[in-house]
């Protein structure tokens, strides 16, 4: 929300944090998918374990895919991408940032209502929001790896890497989970691996091709 720069100095004792537009390739060299993000330049100025967000080890993905492969053809692999992931989480700190150039106005800045890419706690806030939503859907969170989830009633397993989801389960169960996730997140469906009609023969997961 728009705020006066004088408010920023009064509440934080500092000038608004810098910001910029960044083009990010969410695809690869063969199939580029360029997205423009408005980011805050705060991460490089502060480091703390308090703002660390977990990522799953590669072994977790290998185990998930191995379990799916050994369970038979009825188990599918689904890949989803959360769009504008960090914007789903509300800001918990008072953060003032510079307005983007096209909206700049002398004497004004912006106070964050939701997290933005580049704020130091955005990954942690997204992780907490995501965990809350998945648990509300019936998933149990892993103890050894907080990025791993299991829905016992539906038999669906899920690994989260940042804003990417890899799920395994029966087709009907995956459809039910996806319906619940679409109600909570902006999602892009990247495909389902399997032998059925409309299913893919290969998928790219974390820059690795699986078949």
Residue spans of the language-model regions?
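Long, low-complexity, charge-biased intrinsically disordered regions
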Residues: 1-211
């Amino acid at each position: 929300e728009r705020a006066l720069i004088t408010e920023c100095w009064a509440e934080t004792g500092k000038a608004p944090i810098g910001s910029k537009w960044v083009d990010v390739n969410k695809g690869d060299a063969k199939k580029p998918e360029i997205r423009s993000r408005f980011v805050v330049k705060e991460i490089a100025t502060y480091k703390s374990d308090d703002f660390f967000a977990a990522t799953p080890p590669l072994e977790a993905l290998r185990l998930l895919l191995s379990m799916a492969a050994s369970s038979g053809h009825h188990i599918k692999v689904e890949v989803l991408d959360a769009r504008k992931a960090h914007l789903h989480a509300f800001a918990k700190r008072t953060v003032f940032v510079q307005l983007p150039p096209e909206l700049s106005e002398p004497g004004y800045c912006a106070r964050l209502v939701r997290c933005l890419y580049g704020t130091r706690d955005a990954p942690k806030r997204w992780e907490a929001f995501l965990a809350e939503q998945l648990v509300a859907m019936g998933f149990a969170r892993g103890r050894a790896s907080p990025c791993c989830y299991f829905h016992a009633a539906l038999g669906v397993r899920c690994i989260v890497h940042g804003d990417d989801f890899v799920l395994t389960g029966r087709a009907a169960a995956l459809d039910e989970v996806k319906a619940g996730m679409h109600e909570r997140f902006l999602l892009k469906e990247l495909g389902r691996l399997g032998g059925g009609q409309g299913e893919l023969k290969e998928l790219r997961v974390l820059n690795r091709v699986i078949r």
